[in-house]
A protein has these predicted regions:
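N-terminal beta1-alpha1-beta2 module of alpha/beta enzyme domains
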Residues: 1-99
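Acidic, glycine-rich active-site loops and adjacent beta-strand->loop/helix elements
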Residues: 61, 106-112
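A short, GP-enriched loop/loop-strand-helix hinge that lies immediately N-terminal to
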Residues: 101-105
Length: 112
């Protein structure tokens, strides 16, 4: 019997828009695009085609404040924030995939 291994993708901190000044947003009217699931649906479809077994989607309900002891830099440059809630995001990804497992992590402090 051959040894099997599993392929997983960890969608982690930084899967938000990252920098508003980068080429990614395109124009000012596209800034809200980070709120749309299209980018992540495309990623999930690609992982499905590549025979990945599952995607883990990290949940974090905080804005860091380690740089200069302030949230300001993280919010100004969209570093590590904002991002979509994994519990909601998986409801968009599931219908778009055939065999990809979706594993959202949920902060227990946010879900009763």
């Amino acid at each position: 019997m051959k040894d099997h291994f599993h392929l997983a993708w960890f969608l982690s901190q930084g899967y938000g828009p990252k920098t508003w000044r980068s080429q990614w947003p395109g124009s000012a009217s596209d800034l809200a695009r980070w709120m749309m699931p299209d980018l992540f649906i495309d990623l999930a479809k690609g992982l499905d085609r590549c025979c990945f077994d599952y995607m883990i989607i990290e949940d974090s309900s905080m804005v860091p404040y380690t740089y200069k002891g302030s949230h300001d830099t993280y919010l100004k440059y969209a570093a590590s924030t904002p991002k979509l809630d994994p519990a909601v995001l998986v409801s968009y990804l599931a219908p778009a995939t055939r065999t990809l497992g979706l594993v959202p992590t949920l902060s227990t402090s946010e879900y009763p």
